[in-house]
From Swiss-Prot:
Enzyme class: transferase
Reactions listed under catalytic activity: L-seryl-[protein] + ATP = O-phospho-L-seryl-[protein] + ADP + H(+); L-threonyl-[protein] + ATP = O-phospho-L-threonyl-[protein] + ADP + H(+)
GO MF entries: ATP binding; protein serine kinase activity; protein serine/threonine kinase activity
Domain of life from the UniProt record: Eukaryota
Gene3D superfamilies linked to this entry: Phosphorylase Kinase, domain 1 (3.30.200.20), Transferase(Phosphotransferase) domain 1 (1.10.510.10)
Alphabetic keyword roster: ATP-binding, Kinase, Nucleotide-binding, Phosphoprotein, Serine/threonine-protein kinase, Transferase
Chain positions recorded as ATP binding sites: 504-512, 527
Stretches with biased composition (Low complexity): 130-160, 169-196, 209-220, 227-239, 270-290, 422-450, 788-809, 859-886
Active site: residue positions: 621
Record protein name field: Protein kinase 3
EC number: 2.7.11.1
Organism: Dictyostelium discoideum
Alphabetical list of SUPFAM superfamilies matching this protein: Protein kinase-like (PK-like)
Length: 910
């Protein structure tokens, strides 16, 4: 049942009450209002009111004015030919309106044109005009005296259509800012109409700067002319006028020789030359009187183009001055980087230099490794032996090469004067035929320079193709050869080099398998990601960041990446296998942790975050699911898919932070910082908020911000509605209250970072250095469940002879068959990804990286780690039971954790 009040008066087509409109732009002029519908480009219909007067057009929305435009600035108003209800108004943009009826649309257009809206000739004020000859007769229609635009030939040659020159513009008359066209009849008719309606005398401003002080119709430059209506006794600037002598407006304007609104044809001409100094602006009028005054250049007329003297905007008719400036700007633009691309070219130049340095570093690490690592101990004369040859294959053939040997003519010997390790040739026992310690060249044309003491002493050593071998560097040279052999023995890894043993977990973007490398017998946790899923979910940057962080970070509380490789469809990352399980699994079993145990875990988490923050990396996904426990009870941070590098700011930009920050909305909802939720930008302080959430959950067994839905939880996080349990200690409550502060600037750790948090009374008895070195025994050691594995030949791929047991069946489980799961997909999509794959630099090998960078120090370490260079740092029962990768008849017994896949898991990261 409807309770709507029924009224006798029918509802109008334009609903809503009539309110006072903002008509201040019309300045108390009579204006006509029309209720219309405004239609935007997307088809949205809005109720508007158009108010038009002799001054301009207003678009009213209720009591407010959306925009106001002068009549002279409107380019056109026209009715839609397809739909007679609609019409459009064009000035800066094209606006579409819809009237109630076609008749109303026609009446609106006629009224607009009557008031001079959209009229190119400038007619306005109801079509009234004023004579320019001083008489009281009304001027004819504006179409009878049009203003024409003449553009002269660039050759400055007069044509038949070019009008004669006329007097220059006065300084007091403002040239239109965007258009050179001056609508004289419109301005005169508006002034005459306003004076006739109000029947009052209004002062008229006349141009100053003319050569004469009077405002008569005679030429200001000395030209002759007759005007009987001029009043020489009136001051030169103001003339009192009324409705009876409204023709004085036209006569005064005609006296300066600028605008003539008589029935004769007037014109405006522009001389557009290639040179701006030669371009002239002349206003011509075909009258009986003759004016002979010099023309005014655009360079002098440009000072009239200011906002105070502008008569409005007309972007569709730009003046010649703006066109000339635009053409100069376009012609001055070279093909090389300019001011518009200075920043971009600078960034790319820096990036190119960095890539060049990296390339040269890798290239020179092979040839000049022994030179770069030379010990600063002084070298004796007998130990010096420098061999220079551009041909690297024949570099070590002979110890003494004659000076007449053939070689590249561009190679030179340069020797530094200040080098303490290389003696001058004059101090060495020399001989004309041979030298015991030779410094030779491959080019025979430069042998005379080696005998010349002055030339050799003034030269320097070029280290590009230099090899220094001495008795103290024999171990380094031998280690270099072993490194080269070891690097040649390293091959690219594939999935066939590993044996899938168990599914450890399933995440949002992939799976984690327990694998064993066939040649070494080492166990790893292999994370497998689908390339197609990564591309669909736009996780390319996160995946590459995770690989970069894991391959570069070296901390006892962070998992290490050993291998990263790929095929056409999948990405593989082999990391440390941590058998203790997830912290979430142990917290779920215990309900809540004692304060000492929670203090130990949160202290190790803070140490790992401090290491990441010192490398300008934020983690952004701290939760018990991403914290693993090793066999001793220490933590390991894993899953760096949401980490972000290059973060130097503690807070975001809207919070007053400086430096690099992030704005991506990502993380687990229960652990999101308020600045991440609001999108204000976040930095390192967002991780300290997550630390507070984690500590609260370990101490109480629940989340600090509980709500019925996620939006209410976000609101309570932003507002900081924290309810602290009474059973917590005072130090724990104080730490949680300072960590869970919504404002990141006031949060604990935002000013001094790790030092501010570690000095809190809650961590008073924590020895941080010993903790980071794993010298403190953990309060809890996880129970490792043992699972027996069947006997398998690591050198063969045939699993049919392997026995099975109750817990693991390798031959029957299709999920553990690499050929079934990760075989090459014969599809067109796989080949498309390989054309320009975003994961082209994903493959990484720790052994190969160690060989390139030369991190091995001695021959013994190289020989001992030649086959197993990627073993975990901490000794684990897995490595002890499987040393050397040998197989026994009874089979292997490995340690693994219980699966944490269950119905009690919270939702993953967003």
């Amino acid at each position: 049942m409807s309770f709507k009040k029924q009224t006798k008066t029918p509802t109008s087509w334009f609903p809503g009450l009539k309110k006072e409109r903002d008509l201040s732009h019309h300045k108390e002029r009579y204006c006509t209002q029309y209720d219309v519908i405004k239609v935007n480009a997307y088809g949205k219909r809005q109720q508007r009111t158009l108010a038009v007067s002799s001054l301009g057009v207003s678009n009213l929305n209720g009591q407010s004015c959306q925009w106001f435009v002068r009549n002279s600035d409107v380019y056109s108003i026209e009715q839609d030919p397809t739909d007679s209800h609609k019409f459009s108004l064009t000035f800066l943009h094209r606006y579409h309106f819809e009237a109630e009826t076609p008749e109303q649309a026609k009446s609106i257009i006629s009224e607009f044109k009557r008031l001079g809206v959209g009229s190119p000739s400038g007619g306005g004020g109801g079509g009234s005009g004023v004579s320019s000859n001083g008489s009281n007769s009304t001027a004819t229609s504006p179409n009878t005296s049009p203003i024409r635009l003449y553009v002269s030939d660039p050759s400055n040659q007069p044509t038949s259509s070019s009008p004669p020159p006329q007097p220059p513009l006065s300084e007091s008359v403002g040239v239109h800012r965007s258009s050179p066209m001056l609508s004289s009849s419109r301005m005169i008719s508006q002034l005459s109409q306003s004076t006739s309606e109000n029947n009052i005398s209004s002062p008229t401003y006349h141009p100053q700067g003319l050569s004469g002080s009077s405002t008569s119709s005679s030429s200001a430059s000395g030209g002759g002319g007759n005007n009987n209506n001029a009043n020489n006794s009136t001051p030169p600037n103001l003339i009192a006028s009324s409705a009876s002598n409204s023709s004085l407006y036209s006569s005064s304007i005609n006296s300066s020789g600028i605008i003539n609104s008589s029935n004769n044809n007037s014109s405006i001409s522009f001389n557009n030359n290639n040179n701006n100094n030669n371009s002239n602006l002349t206003t011509t009028t075909t009258t009986t009187s003759t004016f002979k005054t010099p023309t005014l250049p655009i360079s002098q007329a440009s000072k009239f183009n200011n906002e105070s003297e502008s008569m409005g905007l007309s972007p569709l008719t730009p003046n010649s001055n703006s066109q000339t400036a635009l053409m100069q700007h376009i012609n001055a633009m070279p093909n090389t980087p300019n001011s518009n691309s200075t920043e971009g070219s600078r960034v790319w130049k820096i990036r190119a230099e960095e890539l060049k340095k990296q390339f040269l570093l890798k290239k020179s690490s092979k040839s000049t490794q022994t030179v770069a690592t030379t010990t600063p101990t002084p070298i004796t004369k007998a130990d010096i032996k420098i061999v220079l040859d551009d041909n690297k294959d024949d570099k070590n053939k002979d110890n003494n090469i004659g000076s007449g040997g053939s070689g590249n003519s561009s190679s030179k010997i340069n020797k530094e004067k200040d080098n303490p390790y290389i003696n001058q040739p004059s101090s060495l026992p020399s001989n004309n035929n041979s030298n015991n310690n030779n410094i030779t060249k491959s080019n025979s044309t430069t042998t005379s320079q080696t005998n010349d003491k002055k030339d050799v002493c003034s030269s320097t050593i070029n280290f590009d193709n230099l090899e220094v071998s001495s008795s103290s560097d024999r171990d380094l040279s031998s280690s270099k050869s072993l490194n080269k052999k070891n690097k040649q023995s390293i091959k690219k890894l594939t999935i066939d080099d590993f044996e899938l043993l168990k599914v450890l977990g399933v995440g949002s973007f992939g799976r984690v398998y327990l694998v064993r490398r066939k040649d070494t017998g080492k166990f790893y946790a292999m994370k497998v990601l689908n390339k197609k899923d990564m591309l669909k979910k736009k996780q390319i940057a996160h995946t590459n960041t995770e690989k970069m962080v894991l391959s570069t970070m070296d901390h006892p509380f962070i998992v290490r990446l050993h291998f990263a490789f790929q095929n056409e469809d999948f990405l593989f990352m082999c990391m440390d296998y941590v058998p203790g399980g997830e912290l979430f699994h142990h917290l779920q079993k215990a309900g809540k942790f004692p304060e000492e145990l929670a203090k130990f875990y949160i202290a190790e988490v803070i140490c790992s975050l401090h290491y990441l923050h010192s490398n300008n990396i934020i983690y952004r996904d701290i939760k018990p699911e991403n914290i693993l426990l090793d066999e001793e009870g220490h933590i390991k941070l894993t899953d760096f898919g949401l980490s972000k590098s290059g973060i130097t700011s503690v807070v975001g930009s809207k919070n007053g932070g400086e430096g690099g920050f992030a704005t991506t909305f990502c993380g687990t909802p229960e652990y999101l910082a308020p600045e991440i939720i609001t999108g204000a930008g976040h930095g390192k302080a967002a991780d300290w908020w997550s630390v507070g959430i984690l500590l609260f959950e370990m101490l109480t067994g629940r989340s600090p911000f509980l709500a019925s839905n996620r939006n209410d939880m976000y609101k309570s996080m932003i507002q900081g509605n924290l309810r602290m349990p009474m059973f917590l200690s005072s130090d724990a409550q104080d730490l949680l209250e300072k960590l869970l502060v919504p404002d990141p600037n006031k949060r604990l750790g935002s000013t001094q970072g790790f030092e501010e948090i570690s000095s809190h009374p809650f961590f008073e008895l924590i020895p941080w250095r010993m903790l980071e070195s794993k010298m403190i025994t953990p309060p809890f050691k996880p129970t490792i469940k043992e699972i027996s594995l069947p006997n398998s030949n690591s050198n063969s791929n045939n699993n049919s002879q392997q026995p099975t047991n109750n817990n693991l069946t390798l031959s029957c489980d299709p999920e553990l068959n690499a050929k079934i799961n990760f075989q090459r997909r014969k599809s067109s999509a796989a080949s498309v990804y390989n054309l320009d794959s975003p994961f082209k630099n994903f493959s990484w090998n720790k052994e190969e990286e160690d060989g390139i960078m030369g991190e091995r120090e001695s021959i013994g370490s190289i020989s001992s780690n030649n086959s197993i260079s990627s073993s975990p740092t901490s000794s684990s029962p897995i490595n002890n039971n499987n040393s050397g990768g040998s197989n026994t008849a009874g089979g292997h017994r490995i340690l693994t954790r219980k699966s944490t896949i269950g119905k009690n898991l919270r939702k993953g990261s967003v």
